[in-house]
């Protein structure tokens, strides 16, 4: 398993995608992944995650965009040096793709909103012949 990490505006985002064989049904074109996300606040300020925007791109180039408030029903406040972790999931109709995106955060001290990029990461299943990503 490969972890993907990217730091933007003093916020480090690490993603670990995991293919879920038990929930996938390849003969019905349903491939399922979970992904563990770790968000570390490396800034000196307290920040709050306001929203998320994801792009899920399958290996054929089909793009699905998802946006919403917070993550997993929360808008966590993350103090300087602290880490927030969560797990979520997605599915594709093909055996591989890529996810990427961004979070919108509020700096609670300056009252400024800023973006943090989510590293692009591969969604690969054992049903692909070669690793395209």
UniProtKB/Swiss-Prot annotation:
Any one biological process term the GO annotation gives: error-free translesion synthesis
UniProt cross-references to InterPro entries, sorted A to Z: ApaG_domain, ApaG_sf, Uncharacterised_ApaG
Classification via Pfam families: DUF525
Superkingdom of the source species: Bacteria
Domain ApaG per the UniProt entry, residue ranges: 5-130
HAMAP family documented for this protein: ApaG (MF_00791)
Protein known as: Protein ApaG
Species name: Wolbachia sp. subsp. Drosophila simulans (strain wRi)
